[in-house]
Amino acid sequence: MSAQEIKGLGMIPMVIEQSGRGERSYDIYSRLLKERIIFLVGEVNDQTANLVVAQLLFLESENPDKDISFYINSPGGSVSAGMAIYDTMQFIKPDVSTMCIGFAASMGAFLLAAGEKGKRFSLPNSKIMIHQVLGGARGQATDIEIHARDILRTKDQMNRILAERTGQPLEKVKSDTERDYFLTADEAKDYGLVDQVIAKRS
């Protein structure tokens, strides 16, 4: 169920704040955005990417020197949508700290590793999975060939970025991503996808 569907069912909790000027209610995600916390929950697609990118840009405009926390619980999804988030994370001035809560797979794991080095975290029972780019082209043989070349170029691009983000040799990343490669939180730390596994706030 997407966040939009949950919102449609009225299942997103509301937070009521009281001040000298009266009372104000926020949905929980808007309230957390005030604390510079962004969530990516569910599939990475154009809609979720647009929401995340907009929030990143908004928080940069609010304070370009204060970190942004990016919580990820995602099975992955669209490469182009994920790369829009990745590029924005690198483009903006604030450091983006990432945290895996639950599951970060495919593009979800890629974005987890894209956080500021030293500020990439996972909860202890989270799982992380990396693999190669998936594609499905239909149509004339010539068009399929064009798409295949593009997928191979994208695969190479993502492997190079993942090698740089993790510190692993490119050949190891290529080999490990040939098939679904599952890691525990501690294994993800050893691999370089995250920097620390956190059980409790300090």
Swiss-Prot record:
InterPro entries for this protein: ClpP, ClpP/crotonase-like_dom_sf, ClpP/TepA, ClpP_Ser_AS
Signal peptide: none
Pfam families attached to this UniProt entry: CLP_protease
Residues the record marks as active site: S106 (nucleophile), H131
GO molecular function annotation: ATP-dependent peptidase activity; ATPase binding; serine-type endopeptidase activity
Gene Ontology annotations of biological process type: protein quality control for misfolded or incompletely synthesized proteins
E.C. designation(s): 3.4.21.92
Annotated catalysed reactions: Hydrolysis of proteins to small peptides in the presence of ATP and magnesium. alpha-casein is the usual test substrate. In the absence of ATP, only oligopeptides shorter than five residues are hydrolyzed (such as succinyl-Leu-Tyr-|-NHMec, and Leu-Tyr-Leu-|-Tyr-Trp, in which cleavage of the -Tyr-|-Leu- and -Tyr-|-Trp bonds also occurs)
Gene Ontology cellular component list: cytoplasm; endopeptidase Clp complex
Alphabetical keyword list: Cytoplasm, Hydrolase, Protease, Serine protease
Keyword Hydrolase annotated: yes
NCBIfam families: clpP, PRK00277.1, PRK12553.1
Function: Cleaves peptides in various proteins in a process that requires ATP hydrolysis. Has a chymotrypsin-like activity. Plays a major role in the degradation of misfolded proteins.
Family that this chain belongs to: Belongs to the peptidase S14 family.
Assembly mode: Fourteen ClpP subunits assemble into 2 heptameric rings which stack back to back to give a disk-like structure with a central cavity, resembling the structure of eukaryotic proteasomes.
PANTHER family assigned: ATP-DEPENDENT CLP PROTEASE PROTEOLYTIC SUBUNIT
Name by which UniProt lists this protein: ATP-dependent Clp protease proteolytic subunit
Source organism per UniProt: Variovorax paradoxus (strain S110)
Gene of this entry: clpP
